[in-house]
Amino acid sequence: MREIELKYGCNPNQKPSKVYMENGNNLPIEVLNGRPGYINLLDALNGWQLVSELKKATGLPAATSFKHVSPAGAAVGTKLTDIEKKIYWVEDLGELSPLANAYARARGADRMSSFGDFISLSDVCDVDTAKLVKREVSDGIIAPGYTDEALEILKAKKGGNYAVIKVDPDYVPDAIEKKQVFGVTFEQGHNFIEIDNDMFKNIVTDNKDLPESALIDLKIALITLKYTQSNSVCYVKGGAAIGIGAGQQSRIHCTRLAGSKADNWFLRQSPQVLNLPFLDSIKRPDRDNAIDLYIGEDYMDVLADGKWQNIFKEKPAVFTAEEKKAWLAKNTDVALGSDAFFPFGDNIERAYRSGVKYVAQPGGSVRDDNVIEAANSHNMVMAFTGLRLFHH
């Protein structure tokens, strides 16, 4: 397949549109079903790079959930806890394959943002993963292959129009990449940098105890950031990104945004949320919306008289600010990555409130001393990588 003709570009008025190889070679992808769009393919190609690098760095199957050219979640395939099964809506599926676990966690980190996602998988899509994808609202999927049964399940999705893409896992892009803006061609070297253990050796804090589990989480954070629109910050725990702040002009707003997402992920594990008495007829996306409102400042949108009766069997108690603060204090050992240096210690202070213990950032700010002092005040472990990871 040398080119794919698209319905339109970013917007319906941007026609004609297609993707192709400038050198005339075949594309490294094959469309097995559906008709992916321009943004779908941007998500697919960025997401594939992310999961293939996660697999290489950790040795575990990996998945990511992309929306508008940034990941909403990314994870490796470790076993789900019973609570994770509940908050990801998969407790009825029994034991899942490692790849399905990876997608459940990638999708479940920020379910509001992942609605209508494009999925990338590091490994051949199996039946467990296909059954999980079948239940979710999603635009498409890319993987290095599909079992016959998994492919049939996916082909039936969206009335037979679900986009299914197979990628050549051995494809390596040219060393030089190009893109055009306003008719002007930009050229740069492809970002082949690998995130490995050596990148975290320069620990600048008093506490230098970096366990293997935290090292893996920091690698996941930086690999995720490598394919996230800048500025970006990523919180990771237990092999999964739990809060990604993408595309913000200020570093502190990245840290706040990602931190609020990480907080929401942890609040969903609280007894107050796990025991919400949903009506049996409430669908998965509506539950996600209700939970998002319930744990936020607009909780009366679901608890007001005339509202809660449409969602719950009985009216839940308000999840008070004091209760939320007490629950969030239990979230610990979170890892944090940043695609560029923290200019002020306020980023560290905000990260600490979301349970951050381990930090990886390039360093190089004129106020590095202030940032290190803030990290030391909370007994954090912080590595300076010397590596900026801007992505646009």
Protein language model regions, located:
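Gly-rich Lys/Arg/Thr-decorated short loops/hinges at beta-loop-alpha junctions or inter-strand turns
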Residues: N23-R35, A109-F115, G189-K208, D286-K307, ...
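Flexible, glycine/charged-enriched surface loops at secondary-structure junctions
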Residues: A57-S65, V164-V167, S230-K237, L267-L279, ...
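C-terminal binding/interaction regions
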Residues: D117, L121-S122, R135-I165, D170-V172, ...
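Glycine- and Gly-Pro-enriched alpha-helical subdomains that act as flexible
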Residues: A72-R111, I242-F341, G345
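Active-site-proximal loop/turn and secondary-structure-junction residues that shape catalytic pockets
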Residues: S70, C125, K237-A240, F342, ...
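Alpha-helix N-cap/helix-initiation motif
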Residues: P36, N40, G247, A340, ...
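Active-site loops and adjacent core secondary-structure elements that bind or stabilize anionic groups
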Residues: M1-M199, A214-S232
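Conserved helix-loop functional segments at active or binding sites
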Residues: E53, Y227, N264-R268, R353, ...
